[in-house]
Amino acid sequence: MKAFTKITAIVAPLDRSNVDTDAIIPKQFLKSIKRSGFGPNAFDEWRYLDHGEPGMDNGKRPLNPDFSLNQPRYQGAQILLTRKNFGCGSSREHAPWALDDYGFRAIIAPSFADIFFNNCYKNGLLPIVLTEEQVDRLFKEVEANEGYRLSIDLAEQTLTTPGGETFTFDITEHRKHCLLNGLDEIGLTLQHADKIKAFEEKRRQSQPWLFNG
């Protein structure tokens, strides 16, 4: 998993509430269990003018010019700004996979669906909860300023605007540690590999019958 420390990046606005996981990555693309390759189909039904299916050449598909993420000013964005209850609907880890593969490192919203929120942390995405008033202000600034960038410092738990205004956000110490060090659940377990090995060796000596056959 990629570590997250600090970024300064373009912000892309998605001015919609209750964006569900089927909108983030439609169900027909869920057959693969690889974590990569979902980016071109993120927001597929809004992003393209035709219906997408696995195996299609996305480079030849007609883009929807009215979809915000297709606008030239938001290309290369690594921060997604959106509205309340983002990631609702069915539980699918493919949703954060698709957003990560698109290039997003952080998502800002007033609220997130619980399962999606947890899945973001497991896949190196930083979900940031701000108040609706703060999110409204950011939407206005993004709209008014082309190339608008925010700076996020995870260690300090701060988000800073180009004008120098700083917002703070909450995150548990455990999740912060994992993101700062790029640790998923496997990586976190491997940090204790020596202790696990020592425990198993001690148990092998004290309870050898468990290891016979």
From Swiss-Prot:
Pathway: Amino-acid biosynthesis; L-leucine biosynthesis; L-leucine from 3-methyl-2-oxobutanoate: step 2/4. Heterodimer of LeuC and LeuD. GO terms for cellular component: 3-isopropylmalate dehydratase complex. It comes from Neisseria gonorrhoeae (strain ATCC 700825 / FA 1090). This is 3-isopropylmalate dehydratase small subunit. NCBIfam families: leuD, PRK01641.1. It comes from the Bacteria. Its EC number is 4.2.1.33. GO terms for molecular function: 3-isopropylmalate dehydratase activity. Belongs to the LeuD family. LeuD type 1 subfamily. CDD domains: IPMI_Swivel (cd01577).
